[in-house]
Regions:
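N-terminal secretory/targeting leader peptides
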Residues: 29-124, 132-341
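Short, low-complexity disordered leader/linker segments with a strong preference
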Residues: 1-36, 341
Length: 341
């Protein structure tokens, strides 16, 4: 009882001294605990995004002498794909990729380079992305995000049960898409878009919920899509599919200045951006050969068919411009200028 009385008295005195205000806990670092950030992702653990992110996380821990830890959560294990952007915007995740595959009206303007047939190669895509960096930075800042890097997934193709060789073959096909722009592409070319999170694509193909799925050919082996589809159709709908590494602004501001520098320097030390683009090219080249070894058939539509698809797809551009307004129009002008058009 005496112990309880003394404890009560001590708390009362403390409250009187502080004017009745609650005493704030000591900062995390003052308590001797490392700063922990969570980084969710959709890619499989063996995919190059996760390999490179793990290298970055290891470098942060090394350079901070254990004062900071970034935990990488692969394969949608922390949040499903559609939740990645909301999670980093509202601070549930301190750092996360903003995938062009899952842009919504929150950041739809970022997807200008993902418009159908805007680019046809990784090199073109990167050239334009570099020129658009200030635009991307500005758009993210409006949502309280700090842009750290611009990197990419390889070009987007179509996995399917039956070959899609001609524009006519698109008609009525139920195809998995991953956002507004990809849905517009499929709809414009005559297909029926079905939004399916990345982690559910295998099951959708296996159960034939869809006739095919739009994604990178590099997913054939790590996601085992070769088990549930027979063809990869090389329409080169986009030269790449951008991904931006973003930090929640409040989380960044709460980080001590020296740890901010550690994060920035670690990305440079592991050559994160360059490595991502290099790996995208390497994996794309390797995927085509490997998919054939796994029993898949590569379908290369005639140039005339791709030209027809490119012409028709301009309707999707107009739909995107209506949704993105003045910022979208400015982004498109910047992209076309960067590509010399």
């Amino acid at each position: 009882m005496k112990t309880l009385a003394w404890t009560t008295l001590a708390v009362t005195v403390l409250l009187l001294i502080s004017g009745g205000a609650a005493v704030a806990p000591a900062p995390v670092e003052a308590q001797g605990k490392p700063v922990v950030w969570n980084l969710p992702h959709v890619a499989a653990p063996s995919y190059y995004h996760i390999v490179n992110l793990n290298a970055f996380a290891a470098k942060v821990k090394e350079k901070s002498n254990g004062r900071m830890e970034i935990r990488v959560h692969a394969a949608s294990s922390l949040y499903p794909a559609p939740e990645l952007i909301p999670a980093v915007v509202d601070g549930r995740a301190e750092i996360a990729p903003v995938l062009s595959a899952y842009l919504t009206d929150i950041l739809l303007e970022l997807g200008v380079l993902e418009l159908p047939f805007m680019t046809s190669t990784l090199e073109e895509h990167r050239k334009a992305a570099e020129q658009l960096r200030p635009f991307f930075t500005e758009q993210m800042a409006k949502k309280g995000l700090k842009l750290m890097t611009i990197h990419t997934w390889p070009s987007q193709q179509i996995f399917s049960h039956q070959p899609i060789r001609t524009l006519a073959d698109w008609k009525g096909k139920k195809l998995r898409v991953y956002g507004a722009e990809s849905a517009d592409i499929v709809r414009t070319l005559g297909g029926a878009p079905v939004n399916i999170p990345f982690g559910e694509v295998y099951t959708a193909l296996d159960k034939k919920v869809v006739d095919g799925a739009m994604t990178s050919a590099t997913n054939a082996e790590p996601m085992k899509f070769f088990e549930v589809s027979k063809h990869i159709n090389y329409w080169y709908l986009t030269g790449a599919s951008l991904e931006w590494l973003a930090v929640n602004g409040k989380a960044w501001d709460a980080l001590p200045k020296d740890l901010q520098q550690v994060v920035t320097d670690s990305l440079k030390d592991v050559r994160f951006e360059d490595k991502e683009w290099e790996d995208a090219k390497l994996w794309e080249e390797r995927a085509r050969k490997r998919a054939q070894e796994l029993g898949m058939t590569m379908v290369d539509p005639a140039k005339e068919e791709i030209a027809k698809a490119r012409d028709i797809s301009r309707k999707a551009w107009q739909s995107w411009l209506k949704r993105t307004g003045a910022d979208g129009k400015r982004g498109l002008e910047l992209a076309q200028k960067a590509l010399g058009r």
